[in-house]
Amino acid sequence: MDEIPKWITIKRIGDRPKLDPVNFVALLPLEEVETVLRDDGWTSSGFDDPAELEGEPPVLRMMKPVFLWFVERLHARLWRRNIVVGNVHLDAVRPAAQLPRLLDHVSNHVAGRDYVAKVFAARGYGIEMAYMANETEGHDGYAVKIYKSDRSVWT
């Protein structure tokens, strides 16, 4: 998966840009990805740190509350290329967060990736793990690759 970008740049006000790993690849139309996530309870996300993939903002941002949207949520930023790529993670507010950084959080990229893998697998899509060589402290360097499989066995 060498041709797929490996990093998303996150720009926070007052902070240096940071890199989040690409951990989601779908060989599906963006609209189909969005439909599957919406059917699982995800909604559009307007609250987001500015993010770019190769200089472009995401075409789709979604979130799913796990425990109150501002305490713990699943979060996705997706870009359309000839395929859909992006980052999915579980955000959790840091226990010691205080004003003015009340919403300072940590992101678990593996938990988010694994959650969406299960969502798509449960709907009959094919799932593979693809090594992206983009490890971080909270990420093992793998992306989930989602594709259409013979779904007739599910109908």
PLM regions with names:
Residues 7-36:
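Terminal, regulation- and interaction-focused segments at domain boundaries
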Residues 48-155:
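A cross-kingdom signal targeting lumenal/periplasmic-facing segments of multi-pass membrane
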Residues 41-47:
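Short secondary-structure junctions
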